[in-house]
Design a protein with these regions (language model features):
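Short, solvent-exposed loop/turn segments at secondary-structure junctions
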Residues: 3, 89-94, 133-135, 202, ...
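Carbohydrate-interacting/catalytic domains
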Residues: 1-85, 90, 107, 438-458, ...
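Conserved alpha/beta catalytic core and glycan-binding cleft of carbohydrate-active enzymes
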Residues: 283, 288-479, 484, 492-496, ...
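Beta-sheet entry/capping signal
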Residues: 82-83, 125-128, 192-194, 270-271, ...
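N-terminal structural segment of carbohydrate-active enzymes
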Residues: 1-171, 383-406, 422-425, 708-710, ...
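Short acidic (Asp/Glu) and glycine-rich catalytic loops that position anionic groups and cofactors
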Residues: 271-276, 336, 428-434, 494-502, ...
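Short, solvent-exposed loop/turn segments at the edges of secondary structure
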Residues: 80-82, 150-155, 219-220, 238-240, ...
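Substrate-binding/active-site clefts of carbohydrate-active enzymes
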Residues: 37-38, 44-45, 51-54, 88-269, ...
Length: 727
């Protein structure tokens, strides 16, 4: 039990000067919050002015002494081993009955041993918390009895949001709230888990020009906010919130950097995810990757060694900038999200109605690490595939379970007549909108698919989860997706501070099976280095072992990584599918990877190869054929003692026979023996219905895949475990 000194006297700021009270740019005599102070009290920002004293009600700063005590050292998980888990402080544990009630939904609850054990057993290395800066909801939400649950309505950059602290800490004051936040970080670090904060530096809670004067606007409206034509009453909005902070102003850049250093040095967090990060890099002529703020992130001695992640867009002109941020920033990869959903859901929905989809080309590009987006840095290839924070879902949008249950958003509960939230979901309800009983069917079949809806939905969830975990890059899982959390079709639950948004821990049998599957897939990722590359694939042969044989590789169609070469008899134009340095369109063949003609005898196998359903290389036509829905990806062991990994997938609506490929025998080595370690057709990774003898196969063997399924094979060489993570 820590003893906290009584809070220091309040530290509000009084506006004074000739500006009239009604002016949109000031409030003479009013109280405003100091955005640079570390503590916050007051919870009635929108009450009418009290001519006697508004201080007891309005949010205002309190000076907080620097906290004492040493924090546990940062885990410093390498990017290649990183698994991000996006969570809301309240939503993660509010329904976790294994926690004492007073800890649920709090900073302390996130670091409770039960919550930590869940994260560790899942395989999470890094928790990314939705905003924890002090924030206030918008007036129109409060007027309708709602709140901004996500917290993207920042009041100040320093003080933590007190409502996420335990009641005891709130009653003890801002110093106790800060101690609880630091204690959370400390305990997570002791468990080997990093903490990233989602920070909102692009706008504030003060709304548009007719908004309230709570802090920044009352202090210096013209100096802090981006304006249209320099007129204080005409705000330029590139964030969709009514205002945007002006990162052309040194004072704004300084405020953001000071805040980041404070949270890193005093609170001990391991990094940040920057909301609408393009706004933070906007200069006089638009987004600039050499913007002073971004340069500071690269050079500041406190910040440059942290994990930094950009949300690479905003809603202003030229706002989509995925792949264009400088190192050391990683970026949310929306192209990965779209490609995974498109292949497994939207294209499958189209196919069920007899319409063509998009083929395998874009999916292959994302599985290979999205080099078309992240392989163009200066110097070239300095970022690598780990710069792609790949995800299928995030806090905004459908949950993983809802992606397979709804074709359309169901947001009426948000109070905006279902106008809010995106309509570009790329989802598929599998024939019936909304929840179904475990044995529900659509007339017994699904438009020609003789399967029940519920099992097929569950398989689609597993396909999406496996695509995320097996892809080159940094996977991000949204809290609860590993347990089938639903928001009942709401794809914009920002106002739902209730069971709609909170993670449910009361698991039905299928949700327990899904959790076991998620743990199994992340364990496979940890165990096999071929699934965790930190450099882009080249498609070229790896160096042979000192005593390894030289042999011929007869055109295995690997150029999906390098996108170079002319292609021999067996060469393909797979560079267009998953090219790296040159980008997807730059590839002309797989010759350098798989033989530039008969008689060429490289000394080793390539790091990446692609095959069709017959076990042969994909030709140019196949890469561009929307009807091709089956793909095999072979990643060879990066070091002796590691295992090769073969991923076999089909988006076809009927079962498919696939011939397993091989590379090592063609190179004069020992033929592969493939061991089946996972199949998305399995409800549980230890599926008792697995057929005897199906777990092992040789190259050339023909295996049967269920419709819309994915398999993972590995060579039997014992893998080396990645350090520092649970088995």
């Amino acid at each position: 039990n820590l003893h906290h000194p009584p809070p220091t006297p309040p530290h509000p700021l009084h506006i004074d000067g000739p500006v009239p009270f009604e002016s949109p740019t000031g409030l003479a005599g009013a109280l405003v919050d100091d955005p640079a102070i570390r503590g916050q009290v007051g919870d009635d920002p929108y009450g009418p002015p009290d001519p006697r004293d508004s201080l007891p009600f309005v949010p205002h700063a309190v000076v907080v002494a620097e906290p004492a005590g040493t924090l546990a050292p940062r885990p410093r998980v390498p990017w290649r081993d990183t698994v991000v888990y996006e969570a809301h402080v309240r939503g993660l544990t509010q329904r976790l009955e294994a926690l004492p009630e007073h800890l649920r939904g709090t900073y302390a609850g996130v670091a409770h041993p039960v919550a930590i054990e869940h994260l560790r057993s899942l395989g999470v290395t890094t928790v990314e918390l939705l905003p924890v800066h002090a924030n206030v909801p918008e007036p129109h939400l409060l007027a309708s009895g709602r709140t901004n649950y996500w917290g993207y309505s920042t009041l100040g950059f320093f003080a933590p949001h007190a409502a996420y602290a335990t009641r005891a800490a709130q009653d003890a004051g801002p110093a106790a709230v800060l101690d609880e936040v630091r204690g959370m970080v400390h305990l997570l670090h002791e468990a080997g888990i990093e903490v990233l904060l989602d920070v909102v530096h692009n706008h504030t809670c003060e709304g548009g020009a007719d908004g309230y004067h709570l802090s920044w606007r009352g202090l210096d409206n013209a100096g802090y906010y981006l304006h249209d034509g320099g007129t204080p009453a005409r705000l330029a909005d590139v964030t969709g919130t009514g205002n945007s902070l002006d990162f052309r102003r040194p004072a704004v850049v300084r405020a953001a950097l000071d805040s980041l250093r404070y949270w890193a040095e005093v609170v001990g967090v391991d990094g940040f995810r920057f909301d609408l990060a393009v706004t933070l890099g906007r200069g006089a002529t638009g987004f600039d990757p050499d913007h002073p703020f971004l340069v500071a992130l690269q050079t500041d001695p406190v910040l440059c060694g942290l994990k930094l992640v950009a949300e690479p867009w905003d809603v202003g002109p030229g706002g989509w900038r995925t792949g264009q941020f400088p190192p050391p920033l990683a970026e949310w990869n929306d192209r990965f999200r779209d490609a995974a959903r498109q292949f497994w859901l939207a294209d499958a929905r189209e196919a069920s109605h007899g319409r063509p989809g998009h083929g395998v080309r874009d999916l292959a590009t994302r599985l290979a690490g999205s080099a078309d987006l992240f392989g163009h840095s200066d110097p070239p290839l300095v970022r690598g595939p780990v710069a792609s924070v790949s995800y299928v879902t995030a806090h905004d949008g459908f949950t993983l379970a809802d992606l397979v249950a709804y074709d359309h958003k169901h947001n009426l509960a948000n109070g905006e007549n279902n106008r809010d939230g995106t309509d570009d979901n790329r989802s598929w309800n599998h024939g019936l909108e909304g929840p179904v009983t475990p044995d529900a069917t659509a007339g017994g079949v699904l438009d020609g698919l003789g399967v029940e809806i519920a099992p097929l939905r569950r398989r689609s969830i597993r396909n999406l989860l496996a695509t995320l975990v097996l892809a080159a890059g940094t996977p991000m899982i949204t809290a609860g997706d590993e347990m089938g959390r639903t928001q009942r079709g709401n794809n914009n639950a920002y106002v739902q501070d209730d069971e709609t948004s909170w993670v449910s821990w009361d698991l039905s049998p299928w949700r327990k099976d899904l959790l076991a599957t998620a743990r199994h897939l992340l364990a496979l990722r940890r165990e096999h280095a071929a699934l965790r590359p930190d450099a882009f694939f080249t498609g070229r042969p790896r160096p042979a072992a000192p005593d390894g044989p030289a042999g011929a590789v007869s055109g295995a169609g690997t150029g999906a990584a390098a996108g170079t070469g002319t292609g021999g008899e067996g060469g393909t134009e797979a560079g267009a599918a998953a090219g790296t340095a040159a980008g997807g369109e730059g590839g002309t063949g797989a010759g350098t990877a798989a033989g530039s003609g008969q008689g060429h005898r490289p000394t080793a196998v390539p790091d990446l190869a692609w095959f069709d359903a017959d076990g042969g290389p994909l030709d140019h036509g196949a890469w561009h054929d929307p009807g091709v829905r089956t793909l095999q990806m072979l990643r060879t062991a990066p070091e002796p003692g590691d295992a090769d990994v073969l991923v076999v997938l089909t988006g076809a609506l009927d079962p498919v026979d696939v011939t397993l490929p091989g590379l090592r025998a063609a190179a004069g080595g020992e033929p592969e023996r493939w061991e089946l370690v996972w199949d998305s057709d399995w409800e549980h990774p230890d599926d008792p219905d697995r057929a005897p003898g199906e777990s092992a196969a040789r190259p050339g063997a023909v295996v049967g895949l269920e419709a819309l399924s994915l398999r993972v094979y590995v060579s039997p060489t014992p893998p080396r475990e990645s350090p520092g993570r649970p088995r």
